[in-house]
Amino acid sequence: MNTLLATVITGLITDENKDFYFIQKDGFTFALSKSEGEHHIGEMVKGFAYTDMQQKARLTTKETFATRDHYGWGTVTEVRKDLGVFLDTGLPDKQVVVSLDVLPELKELWPKKGDRLYVFLDVDKKDRLWALPADPEVFQRMATPAYNNMQNQNWPAIVYRLKLSGTFVYLPENNMLGFIHPSERYSEPRLGQVLDARVIGFREVDRTLNLSLKPRSFEMLENDAQMILTYLESNGGFMTLNDKSSPEEIKATFGISKGQFKKALGGLMKAKKIKQDQLGTELL
């Protein structure tokens, strides 16, 4: 087992060819691409040691986001249901795998392409690199306390823990932690998913934020109105429902209350999108 892998080392350039310099360190040889800069035989070079997609020992002088000793963010590039997810952690010619063994049991909650995971690297007995997601304690140590003056603000939030009690997230732009109760979302977010979350409260006990994925009340009105417009457009521009219809009919058709329905109709009439009569509602 090569114990130098997934660490930063300093080695001696002992040979080269058209494409690579070859660096020696403790009896191991690592190839450094000449595209990363000009060097000379006999020179000492510092870089990150790893194995590429062909399992060949490589060295890179480029910045890497995660090592054995340091956590860093990786971006999901591919998902394989039989293996896990592949991450870009900044390594040339290398995507590091997060094994299915450490991913959620429900594959619907696995990260998708473009999602982000906070990981460190590990090496197995066959010199294969694996990425391991950070434990919740890592985020708790890393994050700063939230403030009690952020009500109704929207922030990007990355999902780092999934529990029955709710979704735990990290806010990268202000280095804070948040929690989303199941009642404040329409569906369960994926691990690593980047969300647009709104602050709805503050937990004094641990200085974290309570967040919601649901729209504000005025945004819900807009969404209801758009839903009604879409329904009218797909039904020939007319529906038998109007503001005199029963709450049961409205709920069965749109899944909203009569109060929400009437507000949405009022907004659409004010915008001159529809008209109502005793027969129903018509698109203008």
Task: Name what the model sees in each region.
Residues M1-L284:
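Single-stranded RNA-binding regions, centering on S1/OB-family and related RNA-binding modules
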